Amino acid sequence: MESTLKRTWAEIDLDHLTHNFEVIRRHVGDKVKLLGVVKADGYGHGAVEIAKRLEQLGAGYLAVSNIDECEELRDSGVTLPILMLGFTPADQTARILQLHMTQAVQSYAIAKEFSDRAVALGGKMIVHIKLDTGMGRLGFSCDEAHFDASLREILRVLSLPGLEVEGVFTHFSVSDEDTEESVEFTKLQHERFARMIEKVETQSGFRFQLHHCCNAGGIASYPEWAWDMVRCGIILYGSGDLAEKMGMQPVMSLKTRVATIKDFAAGEPISYGRTYFTQRPSRIAVLPIGYADGLHRALSNQIEVLTPYGRAKQVGRICMDMCMIDVTDLPQVKSGDEVEIFGEHILCADDAAPVSYTHLRAHETRHDL
């Protein structure tokens, strides 16, 4: 897929998505279900197209961050189970049932309200119980101080008549980091997860159909903790250091064209703030891409881009709609030449932005993906 907007555009390679999916499948084993996270319009890649390809590839589940994202997928014909990872107000119960959406529940109170409303509507809501093992966000707290109280609440959730409890999951906070402290904390999170599951299943006689804890970092570094399913988020899109180490291919390439080229004498300032001065007589090319397109201003004077004739350093402060590159050593570069900001041939998105999630998502509002 390629945008028709030729000022600056993103290209999405679904064959690279297929490659990444198969890499993950081999890494965790073919008995483990793969859940594809397609929240935030598939991290800016186009949720519908990504979801349909994942469905063809045999993904077991999808995940979104709000009910509207689920509705978009259902309206497009996607039939895979869809997990809503975060919070949904209980007054949306009818929509949840209508869309056959699986809802995460993080407290007995919210579970009870969902159950009551589902019973009143003559339905049953599929839910996954969310455990907070150290993220400090949503979920039943599994630290020592709250463990017993959370266990009692979860056992009560299992008996609610309007719910079909299908799964249980948690989210690692530092599984993508390899410091000794981070590794130990990730192990602690997994120990808490396993302990709560063992207590719930032993005391109730109930067994969850799906247990999942591995996000990108978990998939890459702890495949032995795959349980029944892993959640493939940013790593599926080939972005970040972990994806690179696993041999993933970037699904998105961000490209633009040279707008114009100007000659400067040595010692002349480029762009806002006079943060860069030419060190010699220079040819400076202007690109029609800036921080409004996701090329963060903090990257000013730090990155390189790829022209048809080699790499060029970005110089001067990145503007809202434009940035400049030094093509002094690339005399063949001319107006209209295609320039790759990141993609298959240069820079993973992690290098091209402080936070790859933000970077990939930022292109959606400016470019037709």
Where are these regions (language model features)?
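Functionally critical, mid-to-C-terminal surface segments that flank or help form catalytic/ligand
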Residues: 254-302
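Short, surface-exposed secondary-structure boundary micro-motifs
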Residues: 290-292, 310, 341-345
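Active-site loop/helix belt of alpha/beta enzymes
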Residues: 5-6, 40-57, 112-126, 133-257, ...
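Short, well-ordered loop/turn sites that connect or cap secondary structure elements
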Residues: 298-299, 306, 333
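A charged N-terminal "starter" segment
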Residues: 1-102, 108, 116, 124, ...
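Conserved small/polar residues in nucleotide/adenosyl-binding loops
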Residues: 358-365
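Short, Lys/Arg- and Gly-enriched loop/turn segments at beta-strand edges
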Residues: 346-355
